[in-house]
Structures are given as C-alpha cells and as structure tokens.
Regions:
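N-terminal, positively charged/glycine-rich alpha-helical extensions of SAM-dependent methyltransferases
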Residues: 1-40
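Conserved alpha-helix/loop element of class I SAM-dependent methyltransferases that forms part
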Residues: 36-69
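Class I SAM-dependent methyltransferase SAM/SAH-binding core
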Residues: 69-129
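A short acidic, Gly/Pro-enriched loop at the edge of an enzyme's catalytic core
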Residues: 128-147
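A short SAM/SAH-binding and catalytic strip from SAM-dependent methyltransferases
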Residues: 145-161
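A short glycine-rich, Lys/Arg-flanked "PGG" loop and its adjoining helix->strand segment in the class I
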Residues: 161-176
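Conserved class I S-adenosyl-L-methionine
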Residues: 176-216
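Short alpha-helix
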Residues: 228-252
Length: 294
C-alpha cells in the first residue's frame, strides 16, 4: 500500500475491532518478553511511562500523589503501567479488550503481590462493564478518583464522544482524567521519508486507516494477524469530546519526545525518542490533556 489513499478503509467498528483484537492477542507473548514480564526482569520500581506521567499529574492530585486513590486504567494491555500505579499506592482497576493481555496482567500483579482488578471490555463500554464487575465481586468500585490512559491508545477507537462519556461516567465529582498519547500531527507523517513529510490525514472523517505489519513496537517476533485498523483523531476532537462529556480542561501540552521509535530517523535521547536536530521543534509528537469532572 504505497499510496496513502489505499490505506483508507470504510469498515464497521465491529470488523475493525475484531481485526485489532486478533492482532493484540498475538502481541501479548511478544510484549511479555519485550517488557521483561516473561523472564521476571521487569523493573521493580515504576515504569518509565508512569514515572513521567506521575510527575505531570502531580500538580493536579491531592498531595501530589496517587497514594490512596482509586485509579482506573483504560486500555491497560498487559498491566505493566497499571501495576506501577499500584506500586505508587493507588487502588487500581485495569480495563482492556484482550483476554490474553488481562491474564498476563493478572499474573504480573500476583508475582509482585499487587492488588488489582481487571475488567475485560471494549473501553467504549467501560462504565457498564466495571459496574457489572463490581456487582459480581470482581472489582472493588465503579467510581474513581483518577482515570488514566497513555501512549498508543485512542487511535484504536472510532468514537471519541462515546469514549469521553465513559470517562465521565466512572469519575467521581472532582475526579481527574489524564491522557498522554501520540499526536495526530506525527501520525500524519510518512515515518520512512527522509524529511518531515505529511502524507496521511490529520483530520478524521469516520473512516479508518488500514495497516498490514507483522511486527510490533516492542520485542522480537511476528504476529499471525497482521491487519489492523486505526482512526485519526485531531487534537481538537480529543479536547471537544472531553468538554462535551462535561469535563473541565485544566491543562493541555504538546511534546517533542516519544516513548517509542515512531520513525527509524528518530534519535534515542534521555527519556525516549525525538526527531533529529532542528526538526524536533517543527512538529509535536505527543499531547497531554488533564481534565476534571466538576
């Protein structure tokens, strides 16, 4: 698919979700090795992602910490960051659509003696699923002080209004939502071009973009289900979805350093990867939003 137009896919949410789930199921054993979960060498302290995000969240948290707070991690994958929040003192519930990922997360929590609840659901149905888990005795609470999502998350969702409604539904009054994710301005670039060249859409129109890739962002190995679908979401769509759900935006930032190597031209620096030289200041690679439920 050399032509960006060939990547446009008019698929239903159900079809796209099924393909993505198969792909993410395949990623679990690869990521267990890549993160050090399989070997037991995963860092004993906080993950790099959570270390960064906790510092960014601190000014908006009571006492500057998640200690003693109920935290729900949307799209938690194999739980490495969720377990880090538990190590920081939060009472955690992880939400993800992959049963294999949640089984891995549960094993990780047990290995380190961390208490955590895990809820299998599409994040677009998170509120009802967490309430059901509470009713079954599988989760301690359906109301949270913090809802968190970070890095490589919302591109897998087709409906941000519905996503934001789930966040608002599980937050307590005064509760905090935090997201740090890849910026759509970066995703619109050709990652293999010799310069910063926009070839994909920045704005979305409801259609997905289709990708076929046997690799993944971490670890060695290949996936059997190579096809995935992603939806572009400009920053304005993210912010307006949260406002529309009744949340108050307290902070918006854009960043130049990414926790993974989006392009082979990116340089590894302290804290992640960035474009080389003066290109670093030309386009954001991440955005961060902090919002609160009144």
């Amino acid at each position: 698919m050399s032509d960006p137009q060939d990547r446009i896919a008019h698929v239903s949410w159900e079809e796209g979700r099924a393909a993505n789930l198969a792909n993410w199921e395949d990623r679990v054993p690869i990521h267990e090795v890549g993160y050090g979960v399989a070997s037991g060498t995963i860092e004993e302290e906080l993950s790099d992602v959570v270390t960064y995000d906790l510092a960014a969240m601190a000014p908006f948290l009571p006492g500057g910490t998640v200690d003693g707070l109920d935290l729900c991690h949307f799209q938690c994958h194999i739980g490495t960051d969720t377990v880090s929040f538990a190590r920081a003192g939060a009472r955690v519930t992880g939400v993800d659509f992959s049963p294999s990922a949640l089984a891995s997360a549960s094993r990780l929590a047990a290995r380190y003696g961390v208490e955590a609840a895990w809820v299998e659901t599409d994040v677009l149905d998170a509120a009802a699923a967490v309430r059901d888990a509470v009713a079954r005795g599988a989760a301690p609470t359906a109301d949270f002080d913090v809802v968190y999502t970070s890095i490589g998350a919302i591109c897998w969702l087709n409906d941000l209004d519905r996503w934001a409604a789930q966040i608002a539904a599980v937050l307590r009054p005064g509760g905090l939502f935090y997201i740090r994710d890849g910026h759509q301005a970066m995703f619109a670039l050709d990652e293999n071009a010799p310069d910063l060249r926009t070839v994909y859409r920045y704005f979305g129109d409801g259609s997905a973009q289709v990708w076929d890739d046997e690799g993944t962002y971490l670890g060695e190995g290949t996936v059997a289900h190579t096809r995935t679908y992603e939806w572009p979401h400009p920053l304005s769509e993210v912010v307006n979805a949260l406002i529309g759900a009744g949340l108050r935006i307290e902070r918006l930032d854009e960043g130049t350093v990414l926790p993974w190597q989006f392009s082979p031209r990116m340089e590894e620096i302290d804290g992640g990867y960035a474009w080389p030289g003066p290109e670093r200041q030309r386009v954001p690679v991440t955005f961060t939003v902090v919002a609160r439920k009144p």
